[in-house]
């Protein structure tokens, strides 16, 4: 599978320190195999969230598609207060 990023996740990853950015990128590579702490977002077909440390990654995947679109990466607290999954 291929990962595609919207603008927010690209910008957010660039803003992080190198160590954190590398850890997140490693975990995102596993997402290509649909591995990790993944849950479907209720009421949003094709939308999922991935827990990576204290970050939440919102992504979209359509069954049968070869592309996963990373929509948003946020710290845990912000993700549940105002992320686009609401």
List the predicted regions and their residue ranges.
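A short, surface-exposed loop/turn module that caps and links secondary-structure elements
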Residues: 26-51
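Short aromatic/hydrophobic contact patches that present stacked aromatics
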Residues: 12, 47-49, 58
